[in-house]
């Protein structure tokens, strides 16, 4: 856990109750939570990731999509770390995402999500930022994984800036944001 970034370590320490690790990958966060004595369910859509989690000793790894309606358990903490916002795919999926969170998150529960703001990619030498406001949201990316000659299918991935995420969170939940 000490080799993890401070944001991840803090989220793991703050996670309480029944914890859902979304997009768990190899299970590094789930294993750290288990070592801390916490109850964690780790989900991923990759059969290989779930197999790796099993081999590494994750207690409750599952092959399931967060948006699969048959997955109806509830949790006190939902972790979406390491650019976990990506699974939302597109900005127009935010309402569906927050509706889903309302169904699986216990009242008073927490979602810990991180994302990179890609605005820096559009920064000019003078410090100004040039973004095509008529185009798609600048954090919507078409991803494709490749290893040597093997290419996967393309998929949508969302990097969302803090302000945009906050606006959606307030619009679709009962959250209030602190004022400065």
Please describe what each predicted stretch is.
Residues 46:
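Conserved SAM/SAH-binding beta-strand->alpha-helix loop
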Residues 107-164:
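SAM-dependent methyltransferase
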Residues 95-107:
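A short glycine-rich, Lys/Arg-flanked "PGG" loop and its adjoining helix->strand segment in the class I
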Residues 173-180:
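Conserved small/polar residues in nucleotide/adenosyl-binding loops
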Residues 69-77:
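A short acidic, Gly/Pro-enriched loop at the edge of an enzyme's catalytic core
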Residues 76-94:
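A short SAM/SAH-binding and catalytic strip from SAM-dependent methyltransferases
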Residues 57-68:
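Conserved SAM-binding strand-loop segment of SAM-dependent methyltransferases
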Residues 2-18:
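Conserved alpha-helix/loop element of class I SAM-dependent methyltransferases that forms part
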């Amino acid at each position: 856990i000490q080799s993890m970034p401070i944001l991840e370590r803090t989220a793991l320490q703050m996670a309480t109750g029944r914890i859902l690790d979304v997009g768990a990958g190899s299970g590094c966060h789930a294993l750290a939570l288990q070592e801390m004595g916490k109850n964690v369910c780790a989900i991923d859509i990759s059969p290989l990731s779930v197999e790796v989690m099993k081999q590494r000793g994750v207690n409750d790894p599952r092959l399931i999509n967060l948006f699969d309606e048959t997955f109806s358990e509830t949790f006190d903490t939902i972790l979406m770390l390491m650019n976990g916002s990506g699974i939302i795919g597109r900005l127009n999926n935010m309402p569906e995402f927050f509706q889903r969170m309302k169904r699986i998150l216990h009242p008073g529960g927490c979602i810990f999500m991180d994302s990179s703001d890609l605005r820096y990619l559009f920064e000019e030498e003078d410090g100004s930022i040039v973004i095509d406001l008529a185009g798609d949201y600048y954090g919507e990316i078409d991803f494709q994984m490749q290893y040597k000659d093997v290419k996967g299918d393309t998929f949508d991935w969302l990097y969302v800036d803090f302000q945009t995420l906050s606006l959606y969170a307030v619009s679709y939940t009962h959250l209030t944001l602190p004022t400065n």
